[in-house]
UniProtKB/Swiss-Prot annotation:
It comes from Hyphomonas neptunium (strain ATCC 15444). It is a peripheral membrane protein. InterPro entries: ATP_synth_OSCP/delta_N_sf (IPR026015), ATPase_OSCP/d_CS (IPR020781), ATPase_OSCP/dsu (IPR000711). The keyword Membrane applies. This is ATP synthase subunit delta. F(1)F(0) ATP synthase produces ATP from ADP in the presence of a proton or sodium gradient. F-type ATPases consist of two structural domains, F(1) containing the extramembraneous catalytic core and F(0) containing the membrane proton channel, linked together by a central stalk and a peripheral stalk. During catalysis, ATP synthesis in the catalytic domain of F(1) is coupled via a rotary mechanism of the central stalk subunits to proton translocation. This protein is part of the stalk that links CF(0) to CF(1). It either transmits conformational changes from CF(0) to CF(1) or is implicated in proton conduction. Keywords: ATP synthesis, Cell inner membrane, Cell membrane, CF(1), Hydrogen ion transport, Ion transport, Membrane, Transport.
Amino acid sequence: MIQTSETAQRYARALFELAQDKGDLATIHKDFRAFAALIKTSADLRKLLDSPAFSRDVKVSALAEIAKKAGYSPLFGKFLGTMATNGRANDILGAEFAFDQFYAKQRGVQRAIVRTAKEMTGAEKSRIESLLARVVGGDVELTSEVDPSLIGGIQLRLGSKLVDASVAKKLERMNTVMKGA
């Protein structure tokens, strides 16, 4: 799970409120998710955002070019430029995570993250999503992640609660018990 700094949350909140005032929340959310996916898949972009070797001006112009070519909304393009100008380009992923949380809350949706050792099928995801919806009494959006180190089983995070029913966790508990015996 992504850790968000207070600064990233403040930028995300400002963008969220501005997009809400302009009636542009869905567009900004779509642009932000697309840009976050780009960051996650491009090592060069991550290096540009994170490295102090690139000047703020270089970051601003590169982000402006990306926003233009990707067809992002002008508001989102300005937001990226502002973060880079203020030396916060490395906080963009954290801001996306915070914005996503604000957007989900505004829509009355709870977010859950499920980790498994191998990719889940669509039916498995749907079943978990519907079970969680019944538990929380509302809509749930499920994000799945693959983590082979779990060996098997499942980890489920809903808000601040974590249920760890992975084989790795069970082995860890057994190891702890055996060391203590």
